């Protein structure tokens, strides 16, 4: 299932080829494949490729959020062109109770495009996913650009408002069964059991 990020966070069209995110069945998880323009701005994070990097959202990054809108439990996945990644498990808006989990992720840069492939283990997902949103960020300083699959509609914008990727009310319908098959049953997660304690 393919998704294309064609707008900035505030519903303006992007001025480049859209970021493409593909979700498909993987081995014991969801396969997430990213194809995106490579801006090389800002420079690479200082951490080693293949490892979690805190604050990755300050770099060139593509993110996907998977939400249960009834419990407001969600998984945030961040990947970048240089191989670093960041996983956050959130129990309520902005409330990360676990982060920097390991991830099978590889990325490569070819000229002006980068490709990334991550396997998201089922244990990272809360039960009852019914909404999703995805984002892309690049640039530095005044040129920092925030893009959204499901952006804030122009008519909802408030004066002085900035981008906030945790505006859960703008996420749109999405289920894991739409990718895995209607009869697929999501495995239980020991990690999300911790959120209930």
Curated annotation (Swiss-Prot):
Organism domain of life: Eukaryota
Family under the similarity heading: Belongs to the UPF0462 family.
The protein's name in its UniProt record: UPF0462 protein C4orf33 homolog
Protein's organism: Danio rerio
């Amino acid at each position: 299932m393919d998704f294309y990020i064609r707008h900035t966070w505030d519903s303006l069209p992007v001025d480049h080829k859209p970021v493409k995110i593909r979700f498909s069945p993987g081995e014991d998880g969801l396969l997430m494949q990213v194809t995106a323009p490579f801006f090389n701005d800002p420079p690479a994070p200082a951490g080693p490729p293949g490892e979690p990097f805190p604050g990755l959202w300050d770099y060139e990054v593509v993110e996907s959020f998977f939400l249960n809108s009834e419990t407001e439990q969600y998984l945030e996945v961040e990947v970048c062109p240089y191989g670093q990644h960041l996983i956050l498990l959130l129990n309520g808006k902005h409330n990360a109770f676990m982060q920097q989990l390991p991830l099978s992720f590889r990325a490569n840069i070819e000229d002006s495009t980068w490709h990334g492939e991550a396997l998201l283990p089922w244990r990272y997902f809360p039960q009852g996913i019914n909404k999703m949103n995805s984002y892309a960020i690049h640039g530095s300083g005044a040129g920092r650009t925030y893009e959204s699959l499901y952006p804030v509609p122009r008519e909802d914008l408030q004066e002085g408002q900035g981008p906030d990727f945790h505006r859960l009310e703008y996420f749109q319908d999405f289920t894991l069964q739409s990718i895995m098959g209607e009869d697929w049953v999501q495995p239980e997660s020991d990690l999300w059991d911790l959120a209930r304690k």
